[in-house]
């Protein structure tokens, strides 16, 4: 069902005090509802044969709190018959049929589904199970919170039974690829005592119809299976259970050896089989409704069955068989590849690994067992594995945490990316084979299928480190329930719930978010070349050279004349041939391959002309300039909302967008300069290397500063920066400004390294224009860098600075720790200039 929004003659109450994001989209902010309005709403909540500890009890509490906050009406909670007047009735389908004797009027309900009927003061919320009833309660509150008091009568059910989120939380409290603070589950090797944040996380997840959460990292630590920690898992499960959410855990394949002391972890060894069965029994004794296991094996250094020459199916089935008596599910990751492959062999290709490893094992996995071939890139084709496993239950893995996509310091709304994948038709056996229908189990008539998303919330009050990034978690839940929903419609529901119903706010955030994925793709990696980030270090800033000359397999094969991976059957790695015939034909042919995947499937000259008529290299140059300009537009769009959003969230989002605008220029210049240097082909528009408004730091008069050759070279404006001569020496860089007199935005590009908090002051004629501290490790969430590079490169801008031709500009840098107060350049920007 597509959720709709009907305009009514109600409007939000004026903005209240500051908000910190903790409530996410469950703010239940007040809407205007006078006494007449309140009288037209229910007066009580009726639950049938339920207890307070289950999801229906939770639903009644949510409804009571929600109605009081949204419309100011207090509702009592009763356990009575279905005939109560002026009430919200909450029940399971079975309870409703037994108590109300109205079987004929109840629509059929599918997996976790619900029926919502609301006519004024009479509301019925009937779930296929208690979980479904809770989902219906959240749905009703969502409508009210958006000002929708209209009559509704509809049913909706889940697209697939498995709708999980994964946390890559480590036992020490850190989170792998997490950008929002420490774990809410673990610290110092144990489960935390205070689980209050876990309860709020459960509320958020249940409201978007998530039914399972894996609480620990796929690169798992066997110590999670100690008796003390299994007791802690039971406490976590007790918090999630009232919200209809089951917990599961990731396992380390070698645990029978490293924790159990068996001296082996061979999945066919009887002692190993017995060990896993006993561990599983112990877990289910503590958590009877545990969802199951997630296993990463034989990949990226993780142990697996290949150590004993066992197949991946044999490795998976030792867990699946241990789970079967308890009804648990094993999710076995297909993210399996050799990260030591030799790039000099033309036919080697990491993208082939999933099909190579798993296709021949189809049908050998027990029944209770990544969307792209590489690793959550800004653009990848759909994994061909979806078209090659007919007899195996499958789920799709997405990433809410933005590992390769700006790490929540760049606005990137991901629903359009996901929708493009889900709507893709693989044409298996020349029949309609949409990815969304494959993962649901519908296409190949499988009983089990679904979704998993790596989320990685932390202790930051915004959950993901950024207010706007929460749109991705919300969208994931909505799509996992109903993948035909519209990305913009999902987004606008989230905006109204999170920021209110001001049309200006709705329009601005909608435009920004819908433009954000194309913008990020434009200023990072284009035409299917991947994200061009540093794959060997932080996965954050630009470093295109890191893609090649290593065994990780994310190669671009770029040289002086050509670029791209040849994945054709005719002349390349054969990856195109892993797709069904109709799709393989498209990708095999250079002319029919879509431009946005050209370099994924083909190795071509930089001068190759796209369907647009541009050459590959000119498309690179233009796209990177376009993307950076779009990122700067986000900033002005957000600033137009000042006074329409509470001050705290306005300022926190503004800070991220200011940073994104500056870092988009780092990306733009780095990628363009790298390929200009490699190819020797100039930009037709003569923009590269032409920066008339910049003053390079190394060209200024230096005292206590010295030039420094930056690596990678392209992450500095003129390939150089300046650093203090020692970590105890204050540096000064000054110059006479040769610009027309006027008002400028004065920007300073510098490097904010991890391990120090340098301080800078900028003067114009001894007048202080601005001061700042290099403390981004405290204010931003991305993985920091200890180097002067594209990860630490950033910009600060002081607006409206009056400059006279001939003024003296001076910057004083005070180093701290390992950070030598590094500077790249100064830029004086006239109005409407982006550089």
From Swiss-Prot:
It is found in: Secreted. Keywords: Carbohydrate metabolism, Glycoprotein, Glycosidase, Hydrolase, Polysaccharide degradation, Secreted, Signal, Xylan degradation. One of its GO terms (biological process) is xylan catabolic process. Its main location: secreted. It comes from the Eukaryota. Its EC number is 3.2.1.139. This is Probable alpha-glucuronidase A. The lineage of its organism: Eukaryota, Fungi, Dikarya, Ascomycota, Pezizomycotina. It catalyses: an alpha-D-glucuronoside + H2O = D-glucuronate + an alcohol. PANTHER family: ALPHA-GLUCURONIDASE A (PTHR39207:SF1). The keyword Oxidoreductase does not apply. It is an enzyme of class 3 (hydrolase). Residues 1-18 form the signal peptide. Belongs to the glycosyl hydrolase 67 family. Alpha-glucuronidase involved in the hydrolysis of xylan, a major structural heterogeneous polysaccharide found in plant biomass representing the second most abundant polysaccharide in the biosphere, after cellulose. Releases 4-O-methylglucuronic acid from xylan. Transmembrane segments: none annotated. GO terms for molecular function: alpha-glucuronidase activity. Glycans are attached at residues 49, 101, 148, 221, 278, 309, 342, 460, 522, 571, 677, 727. GO terms for cellular component: extracellular region.
